[in-house]
Amino acid sequence: MVAAPTTATELKLGTDCVIADINLAAFGRKELDIAETEMPGLMALRAKYGNEKPLKGARIAGSLHMTIQTAVLIETLEELGADVRWASCNIFSTQDHAAAAIAANGTPVFAVKGETLEEYWAYTHRILEWSDGGAPNMILDDGGDATGLVILGTKAEQDITVLDNPSNEEETFLFASIKKKLAEDSSFYSRTKAAIQGVTEETTTGVARLYKMQKSGELPFPAINVNDSVTKSKFDNLYGCRESLVDSIKRATDVMVAGKQALVVGYGDVGKGSAQSLRGLGATVCIAEVDPICALQAAMEGYRVVRLDDVVDQMDIFVTATGNYQVIRNEHLVKMKDEAIVCNIGHFDNEIDVASLKDYKWDNIKPQVDHITLPSGNKIILLAEGRLVNLGCATGHPSFVMSNSFTNQVLAQIELFTKANEYGKEVYVLPKHLDEMVARLHLSKIGANLTELSKDQADYINVPVEGPYKPDHYRY
């Protein structure tokens, strides 16, 4: 292990690592130790597989928010034998003390809170570059940026014109980073792609990208959709957002949520948790939805289902949770009331048309909180520049719910790494018995005791006594 330098500049120049401040490592380790007590699933996997080392030989390129909870995930992967390199999947989501704690133990980590887009793509490249000149054989992704980088870079090796017309600021920096890498090594991406056995994807947005590639025949390796494990989407997306959304709004603005008019755009699992979060603090919550089933669910829960255009001048708080593109556009932004709070809890920053605000007057209040003066003279408060508010303005989901998600991630990595030949170039989900196992590992921590089926009862409903108890198509 290389002796740890003391500044980000030294880290950039001297070691296989980029973090903000190694002096934060002790603080990060204290929080990491506390988080472990709230993450029983990951601790159980360490106990079960620690001696066996099922991930020995795995080289995992991780692109996922560099938080304290992620630090516990990283150390679990390493305990199970993996060699890991890590970057954050969002420019604002890194917790610098978490990155320092991981770096202090010798793991190559490339993550700083408040990265530029140029740095973000440089760091994402670094997780694909092993110090011995080798490549990763596994990707652990959140949002699909690492996977997408490898695939787009491979296309660019054959036809550089695919990088000619970036459609937004993010693509401008992405395309430039690929061109720079190709100038250094013209076959880097194809070699990397050939080495990868599989990818496990954490979030709704990244899963959508995987299914799109599968449909077009462009998916070059097997993928496991971790997001659609029940113990991920129905827990992380719902209960995690229920706690972390209002935490981030309160930290950023200190406003009283009670009595405010709030609009949640999108009523999937993330939207459901967000709506509960705001209602729980006393806001009057409305929902905007395109899906009639989700809209009916919202109405049956007592929310008003409205069109954004009809209420945009009435709302105090706007939250996007759709995974879609330009949901709140300039035509909506300019009509907002004075001091309206605007934020996003979907993965990417393009749910809100932040680019259309660049020519207006911006007044930075504090990191990730901006006052923007509209042509009307009204000011809006934009949080985290339209990126993930719960990680940009707070610390994300609590450790316990992330243990559910990350236990699925570890199981998915083991599955693909140890059984690579059993999977084709498609998107898969973990089998039901593993989903139930993840839930079972978390029950005792919160004092829950399962009832057991008798053999006669199990036979009556035609399930094994030990489960699984529901068919794959069951909707929880």
Curated annotation (Swiss-Prot):
User: What is an annotated GO biological process for this record, any one?
Assistant: one-carbon metabolic process
Which positions in this protein are listed as binding NAD(+)?
203-205, 237, 266-271, 289, 324, 345-347, 390
Catalytic activities: S-adenosyl-L-homocysteine + H2O = L-homocysteine + adenosine
Which InterPro entries does the annotation name? Adenosylhomocyst_ase-like_sf, Adenosylhomocysteinase-like, Ado_hCys_hydrolase_NAD-bd, NAD(P)-bd_dom_sf, S-Ado-L-homoCys_hydrolase_CS
Q: Any idea where this protein resides?
A: Cytoplasm
> Binding of substrate: at which residues?
T67, D142, E202, K232, D236
Highest taxon listed in the record's lineage? Bacteria
**The keyword Hydrolase is annotated on this UniProt entry:** yes
Pathway the protein takes part in: Amino-acid biosynthesis; L-homocysteine biosynthesis; L-homocysteine from S-adenosyl-L-homocysteine: step 1/1
Question: Which GO molecular-function terms appear in the entry?
Answer: adenosylhomocysteinase activity
EC number in record: 3.13.2.1
Its EC top class is: hydrolase
| Essential cofactor(s) | NAD(+)
Extract one GO cellular component term from the record. cytosol
State whether keyword Plastid applies: no
Per its UniProt record, what SMART domains does this chain match? AdoHcyase (SM00996), AdoHcyase_NAD (SM00997)
Cofactor binding annotation: Binds 1 NAD(+) per subunit.
Q: Which family does it belong to?
A: Belongs to the adenosylhomocysteinase family.
What protein does this entry describe? Answer: Adenosylhomocysteinase
> Native species of this protein?
Synechococcus sp. (strain CC9902)
Upper classification of the source organism reads: Bacteria, Bacillati, Cyanobacteriota, Cyanophyceae, Synechococcales
